[in-house]
Design a protein with these regions (language model features):
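Compositionally biased linear targeting/interaction segments
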Residues: 2-3, 11-290
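Glycine-rich phosphate-binding loop
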Residues: 8
Length: 290
C-alpha cells in the first residue's frame, strides 16, 4: 500500500513539474511576443513620426523660401533668391546642412544638366556620364537612345531619368550616379555658382574652369567675375541667383526610423501661382531600407 502510494505521489509530482514547465514556457512565449509586439509598435510609431517630421520640415522650407527676399534677374527671364536673405548655413549646391535635427540638401535646378530634349545635342550628357565612370561607348549609346526616342517612334520628351534608364538599360547603380546631376525641368538659364563640378566640366575647360572654381570658392562669382574669367560681355542665359526651380531632399530620423522626402518645385512669389510642385517622392522609410 505504501509502495503504491509512493508511486502515485511520484507520478503526481512529475505531472505537476510538467505542467509547471509548460506554463513556464507559455509565460515566456507570451513575454517574448509582448516584447516583440511592443518593439514593432514602437517602430511603427517612430516611422510615422519621422515621416511627419520630414514632411513638416519640407513644408517649413517651402514657406521660408516663399517669404525670402527675391531679386529680379538681369536677364529678365526669371527671378532669383537674394543670398543674403537666408541663413548663412543654407546653400543651393546640394551640400547637406542641419536645422533642428533635420538634414536638408537644396539644389538649384539651373545648376543641373537638363536631359536632352528633341533635337538637342547629347554630347554634354555623354561627357557627364564619362566623368561619373561610365565607359565612353556605353555613354554614347545612352545618348543615342535619348536622342532617337524623342524623334521616332515615340516622338515624346523624356519624363525622368528612370525612363531613360529603362530605355537604355541603365543599371540602378548607374542611375543613382547620374541622377543628382540631371533634370527634366525646363531651364533656359545656367547658374555656374550652383552647378556641381561634373556639370561645370561639361561646359567649361582649362583656365576658364579653374577661374570659375576659384571665384566660386571665394564667394565672388558674379556677372563681372564671370565676364573677366571668360573674356566676354554679358550673357543673358547665365544666372547667378538660385531659382525659381529648386530640388531639395529632407531627411528626418526618429529612433530607428528614417524618412526622406524629395521635392522639385517652382517658387515664383510674384506670379499668379507662386508655388508650383513639379515632383515629389519618398526615398526611404527606415534606416534598414537605405
Amino acid at each position: 500500500m505504501n509502495n503504491r502510494s509512493t508511486r502515485q505521489s511520484g507520478v503526481a509530482l512529475v505531472l505537476v513539474l510538467s505542467l509547471a514547465a509548460v506554463l513556464g514556457l507559455l509565460v515566456l512565449q507570451l513575454a517574448l511576443t509582448a516584447k516583440s509586439q511592443t518593439s514593432r509598435a514602437q517602430s511603427l510609431i517612430d516611422r510615422a513620426e519621422a515621416d511627419l517630421l520630414a514632411r513638416s520640415a519640407s513644408a517649413d522650407l517651402s514657406f521660408c523660401l516663399l517669404t525670402a527676399t527675391w531679386v529680379e534677374s538681369k536677364s529678365q527671364t526669371s527671378d532669383g533668391i537674394a543670398a543674403n536673405s537666408l541663413p548663412a548655413v543654407w546653400n543651393f549646391r546640394s551640400e547637406i546642412f542641419s536645422l533642428n535635427g533635420v538634414e536638408f540638401a537644396i539644389q538649384d535646378v539651373a545648376g543641373l544638366l537638363p536631359l536632352p530634349r528633341r533635337g538637342e545635342a547629347t554630347l554634354p550628357l555623354v561627357s557627364l556620364m564619362e566623368q561619373l565612370g561610365i565607359e565612353k561607348a556605353r555613354a554614347e549609346e545612352v545618348g543615342r537612345v535619348a536622342y532617337q526616342y524623342q524623334v521616332d517612334p515615340a516622338n515624346l520628351p523624356l519624363q525622368d531619368i528612370y525612363e531613360l534608364g529603362q530605355l537604355a538599360g541603365l543599371s540602378a547603380e548607374e542611375i543613382d550616379r547620374l541622377r543628382p546631376f540631371v533634370t527634366v525641368v525646363p531651364s533656359f538659364t545656367f547658374n555656374p555658382g550652383t552647378a556641381p563640378v561634373p556639370v561645370l566640366k561639361t561646359r567649361y575647360q582649362g583656365s576658364a574652369l579653374e577661374g570659375l572654381l576659384a571665384l566660386r570658392g571665394d564667394g565672388a562669382l558674379d556677372a563681372a567675375g564671370y565676364a573677366s574669367v571668360l573674356g566676354i560681355g554679358g550673357d543673358e542665359f547665365i544666372e547667378f541667383y538660385p531659382g525659381p526651380a529648386l530640388r531639395w531632399q529632407v531627411v528626418a530620423e526618429v529612433g530607428d526610423a528614417r524618412s526622406t522626402v524629395e521635392s522639385t518645385v517652382l517658387i515664383r512669389p510674384y506670379e499668379y501661382e507662386p508655388f508650383l510642385p513639379w515632383a515629389q517622392r519618398r526615398v526611404a522609410s527606415s534606416k534598414e531600407a537605405t
